[in-house]
Design a protein with these regions (language model features):
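Basic, glycine/lysine-rich polyanion-binding surfaces/domains
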Residues: 1-138
Length: 138
C-alpha cells in the first residue's frame, strides 16, 4: 500500500490572533479516555481528582471529568496493546484523536460567552459542553 502521509504533511503551528485574543492549535497532547471507577484509577496512577468546567489544572498530568464515571486524562499514555481494562476502568488511548486549542488573551472569556451557554464565572462538575456547536472539554 502506498504511504499517503507524503500527500498530507503535518500542519505547522496554527494560530489566529486579534485584539486581546490568541487562538492556537497545539501539537498532539497525550490523552486517555477512562471509564469506570475513577477514584481507584486516579490513586493507582498518581493522578489528582478529575476537575470540572473551567477549573484550574496542574500540568503536565491532569484529568477532566466528562461524566459521572468518565474522564479524559491529559499528559498520560498507554500502549494500544496494553489498553483495555486497567485498575477498575476501561482505558482507551486518545492521543491525536482530540485536538487541543489554547485560547489566551484579555478577551478570552468573551469568546467563551459567545461560543457557549456557560456562565464563565461559574463552575460545573463536568468539563464537557457544546462550544461553537462542537462537543468540547474546557
Amino acid at each position: 500500500m502506498l504511504d499517503r502521509s507524503t500527500f498530507w504533511p503535518a500542519p505547522g503551528l496554527t494560530a489566529l490572533t486579534g485584539e486581546g485574543l490568541a487562538v492556537t492549535l497545539l501539537p498532539p497532547v497525550p490523552q486517555l479516555m477512562v471509564s469506570g471507577d475513577l477514584p481507584v484509577f486516579c490513586r493507582a496512577h498518581g493522578l489528582p481528582a478529575p476537575v470540572g468546567l473551567l477549573a484550574e489544572v496542574t500540568l503536565p498530568r491532569h484529568a477532566l471529568r466528562l461524566a459521572r464515571n468518565r474522564m479524559l486524562v491529559v499528559g498520560d499514555e498507554v500502549d494500544h496493546a496494553a489498553a483495555g481494562w486497567i485498575d477498575g476502568a476501561a482505558v482507551t488511548p486518545m492521543t491525536g484523536a482530540l485536538g487541543v486549542v489554547e485560547i489566551a488573551g484579555s478577551n478570552r472569556m468573551q469568546v467563551f460567552a459567545r461560543a457557549s451557554a456557560i456562565d464563565p464565572r461559574g463552575q460545573s462538575p463536568s468539563a464537557a459542553l457544546q462550544f461553537a456547536g462542537v462537543t468540547a472539554a474546557l
